[in-house]
Curated annotation (Swiss-Prot), chain A:
WD repeats lie at residues 453-494, 496-534, 578-620, 623-661, 664-703, 707-746, 762-792. Belongs to the WD repeat BOP1/ERB1 family. GO terms for molecular function: ribonucleoprotein complex binding. Residues 1-167 are annotated as: Disordered. Keywords: Nucleus, Repeat, Ribosome biogenesis, rRNA processing, WD repeat. One of its GO terms (biological process) is maturation of 5.8S rRNA from tricistronic rRNA transcript (SSU-rRNA, 5.8S rRNA, LSU-rRNA). Residues 1-11 have a biased composition (Basic residues). Required for maturation of ribosomal RNAs and formation of the large ribosomal subunit. This is Ribosome biogenesis protein BOP1 homolog. The lineage of its organism: Eukaryota, Metazoa, Ecdysozoa, Arthropoda, Hexapoda. One of its GO terms (cellular component) is preribosome, large subunit precursor. It comes from Drosophila mojavensis (Fruit fly).
UniProtKB/Swiss-Prot annotation, chain B:
Residues 454-469, 499-524 have a biased composition (Acidic residues). This is Pescadillo homolog. Residues 510-541 form a coiled coil. Its main location: nucleus. It comes from Drosophila mojavensis. The lineage of its organism: Eukaryota, Metazoa, Ecdysozoa, Arthropoda, Hexapoda. It is found in: Nucleus, Nucleolus; Nucleus, Nucleoplasm. One of its GO terms (biological process) is maturation of 5.8S rRNA from tricistronic rRNA transcript (SSU-rRNA, 5.8S rRNA, LSU-rRNA).
Amino acid sequence: MTKKRTVKRKVKEPEPTKEQPSVSEQSENEEDEDLLQAVKDPGEDTTDDEGIDQEYQSDSSEDLEFESDEEGNYLGRKVSNEAEEGEDDQDEDDDEDEDEGEDEDDDSDDDSEESDANEASATPKDDQPSSSKAAAAQTKEPIIQIIPRDPSKPEYEESDTSDEEDIRNTVGNIPMHWYDEYKHIGYDWDAKKIIKPPKGDQIDDFLRKIEDPNFWRTVKDPMTGQEVLLTDEDIALIKRVNSSRIPNPEHDEYAPWIEWFTSEVEKMPIKNVPDHKRSFLPSVSEKKKVSRMVHALKMGWMKTTEEVEREKQQKRGPKFYMLWETDTGREHMRRIHDPVSAPKRDLPGHAESYNPPPEYLFDEKETKEWLKLKDEPHKRKLHFMPQKYKSLRAVPAYSRYLRERFLRCLDLYLCPRAKRVKLNIDAEYLIPKLPSPRDLQPFPTVESLVYRGHTDLVRSVSVEPKGEYLVSGSDDKTVKIWEIATGRCIRTIETNDVVRCVAWCPNAKLSIIAVATGSRLLLINPKVGDKLLIKKTDDLLAESPNLDIIESERIKTAVQWSNAEPDEQEKGVRVVITHFKPIRQVTWHGRGDYLATVMPEGANRSALIHQLSKRRSQIPFSKSKGLIQCVLFHPVKPCFFVATQHNIRIYDLVKQELIKKLLTNSKWISGMSIHPKGDNLLVSTYDKKMLWFDLDLSTKPYQTMRLHRNAVRSVAFHLRYPLFASGSDDQAVIVSHGMVYNDLLQNPLIVPLKKLQTHEKRDEFGVLDVTWHPVQPWVFSTGADCTIRLYT
Amino acid sequence: MRRPKKYEAGEATQYISRRAALRKLQLSLNDFRRLCILKGVYPREPKHRRRAQKGSSEIKILYHTKDIRFLLHEPIVWTLRDYKIFAKKSGRDRAIKDFRNLKRRLALFPEIKLDHIVKERYPTFIDALKDLDDCLTLLFLFSTFPSLHLIPREQSNLCRRLTIEFLHYVIASKSLRKVFISIKGYYFQAEIKGQKVTWIVPHYYPFKPQSRQEVDFKVMSIFVEFYTIMLGFTNYRLYHGLNLAYPPQFPSSMLQDNEETLKDETSFVSERIAALNFELLRTDKVQEDEEEPDIDMELLEQDGDSKRIIKMKQEAQEIARLRNLFKGLKFFINREVPREPLVIIIRSFGGKVSWDSSVFSGSTYDESDETITHQIVDRPSLSTQYISRDYIQPQWVFDCVNQRQLLPTNKYFLGEELPPHLSPFVDAKRDTYVPPEEKALHDPSLIETHAQSDDESDEEEAAQNEDDTVDQELLDAQLQRAYQQETAEYKKYGGPDGVNEDEEDTDDDFDGEQESDEEEEELDEKTKRLQEEKKKMSVQSGKVHKVNKRQLHKAEVDEHRLQARMVKPRHRNLFRKLIREKQSKEKEEWLLRKKRRNIDNDTKEAKKLVKREAKKAAAAAAAAASQLGVK
């Protein structure tokens, strides 16, 4: 009771100061309250101002009571009742509180009183001590506590009362901050606003903290905004809860155990009924089940867990057995079509060793190159970088090992396979087996003489039939006659134009050279050798035979025969045949009576045949079959070879018809030469090739030789020896063996023998012409370097 | 008659593109890949791609139509389809959490059976042996793998088992022929039933996480799936051929995948090696110590002795020797040496091997065993050494096997700089360059000269020629002085006449050189005259015709070059290609030779320098000493 008083005082003390401003606002409420008060307690008008405060005070006191209820204190309530009874003056406030509630309050009050009465009746002894001191009562509470709780009624009432006291504010269980912006904090039972108590500022709080010794136990009630002073019991309760003990201080944790149900097994049955028979007998159905299982186990239909486990173990992993009965025995089975086994990987060389010989290790340059080809590793010389380790222990795992294995796997299943015949032959094998040149001697092997004297490139060269003298025609407009054995220039004959071609008459009884210079063909008596022969030739050429045949206009316009002018006569020129176009080539028939000339620009009159004895010319072709390159007489038969750019045509001069057309399959023919027996033709072309035609065999070349590295200018057969030579722009003269057998079944044998390369290069030209000595195995070549060379 | 359309016959019908094949087989690409790998079906290169692809010229993957039709009848295609069904159904069970059903389904997982495929791909046993290279290499790699997402533990365990079984066979049959330490791994070559089987064992530890683009383990795993089956059957037959029990029984609990070995990689490896060090159980009790007599040999003797047969005979004898190369030798492997390859090699050539029992299991004798003949060490020095044994580096074992003889160990001693390790697989046709070390091996005479030139002659020459000129002069001067003193003493005390005369002569020489010169001139004139007379009189001795070799060679080359131009036109391109290849090869060879020459010169120079410096230092020390002595 002392505590209650203190509470009242405490609350009262701060209130007056704050209340005054709010009085005017709440005047209406006050009036209502006044009315009520008037009904209930008319005597206490004086305390009008503090009515609200008192209400709150009472409220707090009721709270206390409620709390005490919670603690199971019946006493607190009784005390209050007693206080009402005993000390009216003091506890008027309480009464007022109760009065201010609704009518029900009264009832509840009554109930509580009744309950009090009941309690009193139940515990007659307790009444007396409760009046003394709460502290003293507390000690006795545990005993009291049990008794009132057993019957439900007082408890219910208690809760009822607590309810009634508790609900001062009728807003319910809502967050109280909703009222933060309002002056009131809710509504009481009479639907009147409960005004918030005034708030002190921090200084006030601080002052109170200093001054008030009970400040620490003052708590604010959120529902009403009132400050509540906690009692000692409250604090004790809080402490207990905080220390997680049972809130009721009276609860005895160490109370003696009461054994409601015994743990001992009783010997005698509780019930007096005997057990059924089937509790003694084994179950028939189970027996059946078990016997079935036993049977299943016996028969192997069912397996024990152990067996199952063992089987599983065995089942795991593949089973191996003798798949192949013998090593090589083959059972007929379907296989994939045409199997191609994958090739094995290359085995490692020295470079892959962990400790290779030092030359295999990369030096800086090689390393750089290797690293440079990072993006195209297939171009690398080695797919790894050779490395040297001092000891086996230091060798690390190869970083690309997995990748290599994976690539091999990809190869095996993704790489298209095909069977290919791989040639595993030596390059030597492809070279045809030919006899050694040493067995095919004689043939020219060394350069023995150089004929110097011309000042421009020497176009053509020809040898006297007896083999003593040599004639050459050059671009410096001269024809020079040389003595072969000494290399001396015997005579120089100047002409008016570039000498394209010179040809010594093959008839040994005549001493005539045909010289093609510009568009004129000069027949020159060289005046060397046998004097008789010279004289005879001069005589022969001096008299012109009388022409009884009238030539056609076509020939007349093309060719004019005339005797040479006196000044030319001195030089040795005997007859001049003037053509209408520049002559490129002149060639003699074997007997020395006929000669043919070629004028490439002459269109359909580009080839002409002249007869010396009759001083007559013919045009064998009426139609142009192409750009004629060169012409040739057959050594034996009356045949005429005409080489156009691509093809060679062979004409019969007697029948005047085309015998054969040889297909060269080359772009540009440069020259040709016929074997002295007349069955084989050698053709040189500007596209580096030489073609050997066997005229009896086919119109296609028997053999194509690519001996030269550049355009072949000329070819020549030896008259006696089985030799032929070719001169080319690569400054080489190549001497080859070209044996033609009398046996028709045997193919000609062609063996390149010697490459003679002494000419110098000048303006892309090398060797321009080659000619054989008529008797000796000597070859003459003329070159762009203004020299004629003799190889023996 | 209907006019045939284009691409209805011929090459176009022979090939089928992969897309079409997939459609025909009704398989996904993954399943098709798996099927192809297992069945050994591979794409084909058509003769005319354009025709085979029905006119399109882009490069497609083409299969033989017959192959695809063959796949159509393959029973495992159904298993592959069952997988799909299984995945669908078990996925459903999992989704609706029907675990009872799921468990039942898992027990019924469709197993793929590959036995018939092995037989079909390799109709004879020899065929299987021919294709063993890739199989072994891949399985050896997989046997070192940890458990991966795509490679189940069971698979790598199976690989381990099978490879060890194979190694046991190699050891038992003594069929190992060549070994090689490469930077990629250890190459082994065995000759099994006349087939050369080569495999690579990678250096530890080969596994590294790989990106998907680099390495697809799934593909490799499928290969391994087939190869394990194949190797299993091969092993079975090989073991039975040797009268060995299969699966092999090992003493103790080798090869049991107990938890410990799986957990610990090192113990895993050590168990693997330990298993190799035990004899296998034989089905027949007869110990097959004696060599089976070679039937071939007898036959050969009957046949007579053509060159080839003699060669074969030699080869057979050599191999017989090789098989017992290490017989009677006891090896001990130090713990830093990679043991697996060494154990295989030593055991398969008849040696005994052991290692430190405290570190690895499976050792048979201790280091302190006095009967050990060789201890293999791979560190620069060893604290405790026994006199009774050779301490060698592991390369010795490899080189011995490749040379087929026990090499002298001096070059392989502890801490010695090793001679280069040469590959036994070089093909004389492929690699024309032969390093000097290999030349020396073929020709024992070269060894000595090489060694001599290396060690003695060169250095001495150098020393005499260049280094010691100063020293030599000094020495000579000293000697001469000593000699003069001696002669002077001799004069003083008198001696035999002959000696005196000699001295006079020498004195003359010293004093009157001019006189002697004059005399000589006179003599010369006389002789000249005489000679001239003689020349007139006598027949001159003929001069030997000197052949200019270089010119001759040039002529030959020219000749050959000309003849080479006579190659038939249809062979010309091929000829050119061959020549180009030859030239590049020659160039390579030349480069290597040049490099080697430079290196040798450099090392020689370095040696000389070292020696010279040493000598100089010695001379300086000697001079200092002599000076001290004089003082």
